[in-house]
Amino acid sequence: MTTYLEFIQQNEERDGVRFSWNVWPSSRLEATRMVVPVAALFTPLKERPDLPPIQYEPVLCSRTTCRAVLNPLCQVDYRAKLWACNFCYQRNQFPPTYAGISELNQPAELLPQFSSIEYVVLRGPQMPLIFLYVVDTCIEDEDLQALKESMQMSLSLLPPTALVGLITFGRMVQVHELGCEGISKSYVFRGTKDLSAKQLQEMLGLSKVPVTQATRGPQVQQPPPSNRFLQPVQKIDMNLTDLLGELQRDPWPVPQGKRPLRSSGVALSIAVGLLECTFPNTGARIMMFIGGPATQGPGMVVGDELKTPIRSWHDIEKDNAKYVKKGTKHFEALANRAATTGHVIDIYACALDQTGLLEMKCCPNLTGGYMVMGDSFNTSLFKQTFQRVFTKDIHGQFKMGFGGTLEIKTSREIKISGAIGPCVSLNSKGPCVSENEIGTGGTCQWKICGLSPTTTLAIYFEVVNQHNAPIPQGGRGAVQFVTQYQHSSGQRRIRVTTIARNWADAQTQIQNIAASFDQEAAAILMARLAIYRAETEEGPDVLRWLDRQLIRLCQKFGEYHKDDPNSFRFSETFSLYPQFMFHLRRSPFLQVFNNSPDESSYYRHHFMRQDLTQSLIMIQPILYAYSFSGPPEPVLLDSSSILADRILLMDTFFQILIYHGETIAQWRKSGYQDMPEYENFRHLLQAPVDDAQEILHSRFPMPRYIDTEHGGSQARFLLSKVNPSQTHNNMYAWGQESGAPILTDDVSLQVFMDHLKKLAVSSAA
């Protein structure tokens, strides 16, 4: 018998699914008392090298309101060649191609190990991938040079049939015509005036070609006139490389004390409009590179006077940020237009000050695009992160999917409340849609324009079975995830994942339900919900809501005597959950103090799309200790772990930090590592560096690398993350010298837990 931990792990590896509960309460009333909803983290394109795509199309249920895909949970009558849908119980005839099936000769989609399966749609044309570069030229020469080199590098990684386009912007916006031999030709637009797709179509002479023509198969080899701005790489590789090399800084003079006039809002609007007119519903990626905030035209986020700083959280709270609402509205409209046509928007922002990510965040968030934030385009952090966008799989294909749609089907006793992640609603009302919305709800279909192997959505469900309608013994609830997308090879693919979980009566089998709790998944699902609320609610209100949910969970599943906090016990399945909540409350996802609005938007963007493992690291960073007393070991994220004779490696997802304890730092300063007799010290110093390099080489986006020591200014990154179990207030009461006192008034995990226990056992609660 496998344990729940093994069961959870197997399901994640096979199906890319993690549920908060792995046995479901069988009535609506009992489900609401569980505090944490029945919900799942789902990674649609979870990498499965052992799962080759199948070269035929899925068999669908014939009932028009169902259309579920044949799967291992369906009952099959091999003699009559019939199958019964496990969602609506409709009996269906197998298509003629299945005439040879039997108990001994089953198609792959009926085998239990293929609960996830990928089909290749052989109908329809194969479309090329489209990459449209949108480049800010109001940046320093050194930065611009580095950016040009990165873009030239990316051209060499694109498939030869991919179409590319180039738009540059400063005070004006230039759309470059790429088909001209020996001459640079571009259309110039004013950066202060927005254009509709129709106006753009007429101005660029795109209106002569019907939209349908641009999406038919033969047109790919013979690009229509509308492709003057989007040309195959193999045809214009040299020209575009030269054109990029010749790009100059924006020529408009910038007076003293002023910011350059930058028309980011209009540039992005033209990019969205260009793709809308020429290639709707085809996999396309707008890659926008910005080196500062928009200072004119629609979408501007700050004026051009340098003495007026860009908005802070304080300004926003005091309603003193005059451009935020208007700027956000402009970019939201663009994000929705791009999402409708299935196009992805990436934003690569590199500057020392804010660039307006707060206002622009909806563009990558709604289209499944990337958001990358750095100090300069001339850093390895940007260069390597950008290179990783073009990572390829073992078959030499990009690890990116385009124009995805996710449809979810459920059994009758459960409905879908909504999804939180990089998606937009397709407003598809079906029988399995709940009236209680969580996140993007009121639909059973979502559009995910850009997908990577780690893109993960949080899906929330509602048990609707009534209390007085018992589910038969041994009954199971089922959910089917159907993801259709354009593979980077140009093929349309459909990945189908079908899972089932047992029902249990919460009044008689509460132990079974409690034992099935996945505390890691639950923590991330509740965190996504809290961050989603934080976008529209006051920070303290969100923290209070989170605390209330935690107290209720402790009251429901803890073991205790009324009014006796010392008697409180949590079973192993719940024991880490309060600790996750403690670190979540202190995290930059919910605490905006000390972070700019752009930084908060950046952190939240990544949390809302990453898989479970990476999300857990973001909430509760991992700490490893290196010392002479043994091999490297994971240690508690606690101030007591900071010792003089230790090196610590902390991974927060966004940063990799190496911290040298006081003694180690002194030895390093004295140069002992360079003396042959202290070779073991040299190895000790090198070990965390090697481990850090491994993480730096594989993660997207590449983390910031920090090397610091006791008393170093950057040690603050470590001190702000660890649990302050020893502070300047209690350090002398411990009667020992271990650990480092943290100068903070924040409560420690111990104090937090004591308060939690007191509130959970209180009879007044």
UniProtKB/Swiss-Prot annotation:
GO molecular function (one): zinc ion binding
Q: How does it sit in the membrane?
A: Peripheral membrane protein
Name the organs or tissues of expression. Answer: High levels in brain and fibroblasts.
Q: Which domain of life is it from?
A: Eukaryota
Among the GO biological process terms of this entry, one is: COPII-coated vesicle cargo loading
In the record for this protein, the Gelsolin-like repeats are positioned at 632-718
> Which SUPFAM superfamilies does this chain map to?
beta-sandwich domain of Sec23/24 (SSF81995), C-terminal, gelsolin-like domain of Sec23/24 (SSF82754), Helical domain of Sec23/24 (SSF81811), vWA-like (SSF53300), Zn-finger domain of Sec23/24 (SSF82919)
Q: Name one GO cellular component term.
A: perinuclear region of cytoplasm
**Which amino acids does the record list as binding Zn(2+)?**
61, 66, 85, 88
Which PANTHER family does the UniProt entry name for this protein?
PROTEIN TRANSPORT PROTEIN SEC23, PROTEIN TRANSPORT PROTEIN SEC23A
Q: What family does the database annotate? A: Belongs to the SEC23/SEC24 family. SEC23 subfamily.
Q: What is this protein called?
A: Protein transport protein Sec23A
Q: What species is this protein from? A: Mus musculus
Tell me the gene name.
Answer: Sec23a
